[in-house]
């Protein structure tokens, strides 16, 4: 097994293990984060009825304007700020953070801190 597929399998195992414990509700949805090499995606999920409350990613024009590259910490900060603004518009201030098996470092940390700075608490 190559080191890349082993790393992905380890992340998926962490994801399953944590997902058993973390559930989002209507009052406190789950902030789910996914990152690829070029983009980062974040969404607020209500697990009780399986719906997405709000979402933001570097694919949105409001986030990607003014960015040279969408796969860095600066882009992650803009995604976190945009998601926090959408959540506060729907009167959601408390969330459960789900890092989706990724390490809390780099882009994941930048997104989380930007969301906290813009009004979300977790």
From Swiss-Prot:
Annotated keywords: Ribonucleoprotein, Ribosomal protein, RNA-binding, rRNA-binding
Record region (Disordered): 1-21
Basic residues: compositionally biased ranges: 8-21
GO molecular function: 5S rRNA binding; structural constituent of ribosome
Cellular component GO terms held in the UniProt record: cytosolic large ribosomal subunit
Protein name as it appears in the record: Large ribosomal subunit protein uL18
HAMAP family hit by this protein: Ribosomal_uL18_B (MF_01337_B)
Function: This is one of the proteins that bind and probably mediate the attachment of the 5S RNA into the large ribosomal subunit, where it forms part of the central protuberance.
Example of a GO biological process term: translation
Gene3D superfamilies: 3.30.420.100
Biological source species: Geotalea daltonii (strain DSM 22248 / JCM 15807 / FRC-32)
CDD domains assigned: Ribosomal_L18_L5e
Family to which this protein belongs: Belongs to the universal ribosomal protein uL18 family.
Gene name per UniProt: rplR
UniProt subunit comment: Part of the 50S ribosomal subunit; part of the 5S rRNA/L5/L18/L25 subcomplex. Contacts the 5S and 23S rRNAs.
InterPro entries reported in the protein's UniProt record: Ribosomal_uL18_bac-type, Ribosomal_uL18_bac/euk
The organism's taxonomic lineage, starting at the top: Bacteria, Pseudomonadati, Thermodesulfobacteriota, Desulfuromonadia, Geobacterales
């Amino acid at each position: 097994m190559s080191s890349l597929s082993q790393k992905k399998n380890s992340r998926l195992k962490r994801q399953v293990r944590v997902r058993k414990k973390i559930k989002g509700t209507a009052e406190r949805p789950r902030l789910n984060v996914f990152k690829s090499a070029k983009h980062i995606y974040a969404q607020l999920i209500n697990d009780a009825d399986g719906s997405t409350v709000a979402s933001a990613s570097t694919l949105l024009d409001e986030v990607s304007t003014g960015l040279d590259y969408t796969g860095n910490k600066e882009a992650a900060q803009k995604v976190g700020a945009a998601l926090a603004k959408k959540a506060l518009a729907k009167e959601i201030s408390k969330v459960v953070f789900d890092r989706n098996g990724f390490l809390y470092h780099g882009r994941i940390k930048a997104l989380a801190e930007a969301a906290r700075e813009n009004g979300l608490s977790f």
